[in-house]
Regions:
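DUTPase catalytic domain/fold
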Residues: 1-126
Length: 128
C-alpha cells in the first residue's frame, strides 16, 4: 500500500520533471520545482505549473509553503500565503490533481522563474 508521494501528471510525462526531494535527511519539506519558464512582472501574480500531483492518506493534507530564499531575495510570496492540497485532489476529474503554485511579486523588478527552479516546499500533515 502506498502511503504518500508524488507522481508526474500525464501532460508533463515527457517534459523531464523531477519528483520532489528533501535537501537533507532532516529537512521537513520536499522541494518543488517549476515545470516551466515564466516572468512574473513587478506587482503582479502568476500561476506556475509543477507537473506534479500528490497522493496521501485520507486524514492528511499537503501544506505548500514559499521557499524563504524566494521571499527574501526575489520578493515573491504565495498568493494565498499557504497552499493546501487535500487528499481527494489527487487524480480529480478537472486537472488530474496538478499542483499549481500561485506566486505574487511584491518587488519593484520583474522576476524570472526558470524550469527546475525550486519555488516551494511541501510538507505532509495530518488534520484532525
Amino acid at each position: 500500500m502506498r502511503n504518500r508521494g508524488f507522481e508526474i501528471v500525464s501532460d508533463f510525462k515527457d517534459k523531464h520533471i523531477n519528483l520532489p526531494t528533501r535537501k537533507t535527511s532532516k529537512s521537513a519539506g520536499y522541494d518543488i520545482e517549476a515545470a516551466e519558464d515564466k516572468i512574473i512582472k513587478a506587482g503582479k501574480m502568476a500561476v506556475i505549473a509543477t507537473g506534479l500531483k500528490a497522493y496521501m492518506q485520507d486524514d492528511e493534507y499537503l501544506g505548500i509553503h514559499i521557499r524563504s530564499s524566494l521571499a527574501l531575495k526575489k520578493h515573491l510570496n504565495l498568493v494565498n500565503s499557504q497552499g493546501v492540497i487535500d487528499a481527494d485532489y489527487y487524480n480529480n476529474e478537472d486537472n488530474e490533481g496538478h499542483i499549481m503554485i500561485g506566486l505574487i511579486n511584491f518587488g519593484n523588478e520583474d522576476v524570472e522563474i526558470t524550469k527546475g527552479m525550486r519555488i516551494a516546499q511541501a510538507l505532509s500533515l495530518i488534520h484532525i
